[in-house]
Amino acid sequence: LNPAKHMIAVTSETSPLAHNPDYLAAFYMDDYIGGRYSSTSGVGGAVLSLAFGPQVFADFLDGAAAADATAKNKDIRKNPALMDALIGIYERNVQEYPSTAVLPYSQALSRFPAHLQQLDMESNGKQVNRDGNAINYVTGPVIFGEPGTNGQHSFYQLLHQGTNIVPLQFIAFSKNQTGKDVVIEDSTSQVKLCANVVAQIVALACGKKDADPNKTFEGNRPS
């Protein structure tokens, strides 16, 4: 395989690879851009544009810019990122919950929990502040997750009945994200998937008593 015909380089303009004739082309990114932001740089731009076309990447950047603008809003009722951050601080430092589960009910987001895991745990995985002084509070939870309904048959047992309370973040869509919705017994597969989400949220919040202690779950689990 000839790199000059099949491979591109995405690197800093000061890198030895920047003007290397052994590659078909080079795309540049500033050397101060960290990995957690690379999806909106030349790294993400090259991959998304080649795979889906430049307009998709342009739309992606527009969405990122809109999210940035929303994150600057001082009104917490209009700033979901700020609301989520404050809830997370409360759950970790006041309630002392050790972890958070991200549960997308869409196979299209199968890797989204891992993405959030990297963003949150790399960004907050510190023991000193920017001045080098030791931090006297907990910086973040362990983030994990899996698409539903796979997780329901994997680790939801602990979420419902375990002795540790794990805050949950459910993600669901009214429409199928892959365009492959099917009708089964008078309702679509997406409707059934959404019903699973609602049932889990209600069960986690309300719990259920049973004569058999092994089947009892107390509820009062935040999601």
Where are the regions a protein language model picked out?
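A SIS-like phosphosugar-recognition module
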Residues: L1-S223
